[in-house]
Amino acid sequence: MVTLCIRYKFNPDKITGIQEYFENEQRVIERSGGKIVGYFLPTDFAGPTDEAIGLIDIPSVSVYEDYRQRLADDPEHKANVAALTASGATVSMVRSFIRRVPVQ
C-alpha cells in the first residue's frame, strides 16, 4: 500500500471552490480504485492559510496507472475539475507518494 499525497496551493479567498471539489471528488476517487484517507484544509489560527492536502491510499504504484486512467475517463471527475478550474481557487497541485511508518 502506498499513499498518494496531493499538496494544493490555493487562493484563501476562494476556499469554497476547493472545499466543494474535495467534497465532490471523494466518490469518484473511491469508484476509480483509491481509498480516501482524507482531505485537509488549513485552520485560520496557525500555519499557512493557502495550503491543503489530500491523502489517497492506492494498493501499489503499478495500480496507480490504472487508477489515473479510470479517473481521467470519468465524466464526474471531468466536471469536478472544470468547476475547480472555473472557481479560480487552485494555484498549484503537487503529487508524491508517501509511505506509513508503522506505529509501535
What residues fall within each predicted segment?
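Residues that cap or initiate secondary-structure elements
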Residues: 12-14, 60-62, 101
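Short, surface-exposed ligand-recognition loops at beta-strand->loop->(often short) alpha-helix junctions
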Residues: 10-20
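Short, well-ordered beta-strand segments in beta-rich or mixed alpha/beta enzyme
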Residues: 2-9, 40-72
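Intrinsic disorder/low-complexity detector
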Residues: 1-2, 46, 74, 86-104
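An amphipathic, aromatic/His-enriched active-site/gating alpha helix that lines ligand/cofactor pockets
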Residues: 20-38, 57-95
